[in-house]
Regions:
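Short, charged/polar surface micro-motifs in flexible loops or helix N-caps
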Residues: 12-14, 36-37, 56-59
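A short glycine-rich, His/Asp/Glu-containing loop-to-beta-strand
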Residues: 3-7, 25-34, 47
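The conserved catalytic core of RNA pseudouridine synthases
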Residues: 43-53, 60
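Short, acidic/hydrophobic/Gly-rich beta-strand patch recurrent on exposed beta strands
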Residues: 28-33, 50-53, 93-96
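Conserved positions in beta-strands of structured domains
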Residues: 11, 17, 54, 78-80, ...
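Beta-rich strand-turn-strand
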Residues: 54-90
Length: 115
């Protein structure tokens, strides 16, 4: 089973994109997920997790979310690799989100939206 559930905040505004043929909408964004423990200096650290979401759900996220918006999402982990322009092999990991829920944004703090 490949299932991930995350709670975090967007680090910048999401942008709606479309596949090359224009048929499918998607967005990619990064959320900061706070770790459950503090570092030696007492500070809380965050992990930056790349997220991709497709279709109508991507449109909803781009319409209602912005930098700082809090989101809970579930999906699956996808890994892959590619060669950069210098021929070095790079490895990637991202979450392909399937469902999400967020509460409010900077404009409407009490609105609940689910996808």
């Amino acid at each position: 089973m490949n299932k991930i559930v995350l709670l975090g905040r967007l680090i910048k505004d999401p942008e709606l994109r479309h596949t090359e043929n224009g048929e499918k909408a998607y967005t990619k964004f990064i959320i900061a997920v706070e770790r459950s423990f503090k570092s030696a200096d007492g500070a809380r650290k965050c992990d930056l997790i790349p997220i991709t979401i497709w279709g109508k759900k991507a449109e909803v996220i781009c319409k209602y979310m912005q930098k700082g918006s809090c989101i809970t999402l579930s999906g699956r982990l996808r890994t892959g690799n590619y060669e950069d322009k210098d021929g070095n092999k790079k490895y990637i990991a991202e979450v392909i989100a399937e469902d999400f829920k967020f509460i409010g944004n900077r404009k409407e703090q009490n609105e609940v939206v689910e996808g």
